[in-house]
Amino acid sequence: MVSTKGRLVVDPEYLDLLAQSNCVVQVSMVCSKYDPLEPGTPPYEERLKIVETLAGRVQRVIVRIQPYMPEVFKDVMANIPRLAAAGVYGVVVEGMKFYKAKKGMVKIGGDHCYPLNVLRPHFEAIKAECHRHGLKFYAGENRLRAMGDSMTCCGIDGLEGFKGNEYNLCMLMNGQNPEPTELMKQIGTGGCFQSLNQIAGINKKINNQSFYGLMQEELGGKLDYYKKMFGLDE
């Protein structure tokens, strides 16, 4: 998996290497209106040419419409047939997250986000237009993840040689009932939880538990919090 907004991926030496690999390439590109916000990066139209070059050489090209803002809805919709013509496999869409509070936003965890009643109709329209042109649609927005053609939103779904980690809170909260791997059940596999629990003595507790056990504990103790995070409280 390669994710970029740069032009280096189509330099011959790197393009040849990607062509020899079982590789999905993601390119971040929303629309031309974002060009002034990203000085030093290729403008949208150049990225479209980059995508077209990549599409014939790699397993899949995924366009990341991230971060999405409702103000560019018409631009995004108008570009979907162009993405299909360029050989794109699918798009992943996620709403903009703001650090500071803004009027009309809702606070989700540490972010200020667009409310679902704003994002949902946009996502539904974008999804329908993608399908009309033969593109896959993925929702990078946690609260709308289940809208996607796969809840593994990076674009690797069904591709030989790739297997996503389905045992995550997003899957569990959306009723997918994924099974943990045997390794996840082994004691001492929950190290990633140390970053979520930075309190004295927590390392000893985590080291004596499994990833699976800590996931169940996390879900059971913060159910209302995660319902809000994954848009299931409305």
State each model region's role:
Residues 1-122, 129:
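Conserved AdoMet/S-adenosylmethionine-binding subsite of the radical SAM
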